[in-house]
Amino acid sequence: RVQRGDNDVEVEVFDGSEIGRLQVGFNRMMEESAERRVLRELFGQHVGEDVARRALQFGTELGGETRFVAVLFVDMVGSTATASERPPGDVVVLLNEFFRVVVDVIDKHHGFVNKFMGDAALAIFGAPLDRPDAPTAALAAARDLRFALNDITGLDIGIGVSAGLAVAGNIGAKERFEYTVIGDPVNEASRLTELAKLRPGRVLASTSAVYFASDEEQEHWELGDQVQLRGRRRLTHLAWPVERP
């Protein structure tokens, strides 16, 4: 049973002989194995399965590496007003449903939900696992996410997508750190999300993300105007999804 992956095994201890001591040792080993399994599962829930797997394989040293990634940022509109107008319990229910949909859609497109920030979520494609089609996956996820979130009553959102080089790795102090991505694509996606809240479709992407996407995915996007996003020197050329019939 253990060989088949069944860790819920306990042998009966018959006596205090050598065989009995071996039986006690086996049971203790299986208890520790079960505890490690639970810890791995909890670790994966907190940081994501890919990050947990990477940490177990390569360790948790601080530092990062340059990766080509696509970043998707999604944020609720008017969350402050929502929190003041609804009972706290209702707000928690709304947030949990919002994040559940976000995780489901991002997982479907093989992305990594890096963090929840209040009423927003940051998703990464291309780290910690390489993805040559990261922009394609992020753009497709953005389109699907917009429609999936439409089903949640009382929820309005903005979604931004960008792509480019960023530093991905364990950032923080030795005592406390997190796996995250830092760089221009993250900043641009965040600013695009702010602007998307003011646009009818609620979804915006940089044309750099669209440029690196597959031909099939590009057909779902329309190129638009150039804008000066807050905190950025160069202009960002916008793109948004083609309206579905």
Segments predicted by a language model, with ranges:
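Hydrophobic alpha-helical membrane-association signature
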Residues: 91-98, 137-141, 145, 185-188
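The cytosolic transmitter module of two-component sensor histidine kinases
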Residues: 15-22, 65, 91, 135, ...
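Juxtacatalytic helix/coil linker segments
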Residues: 33-113, 117
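HAMP signal relay modules and closely related sensory coiled-coil linkers
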Residues: 1-2, 6-29, 36-37, 41, ...
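Catalytic core of nucleotidyl cyclases, primarily class III adenylyl/guanylyl cyclases
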Residues: 74-77, 105-137, 149-186, 236-238
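Cytosolic regulatory/linker segments at or just downstream of nucleotide-handling modules
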Residues: 166, 189, 195-245
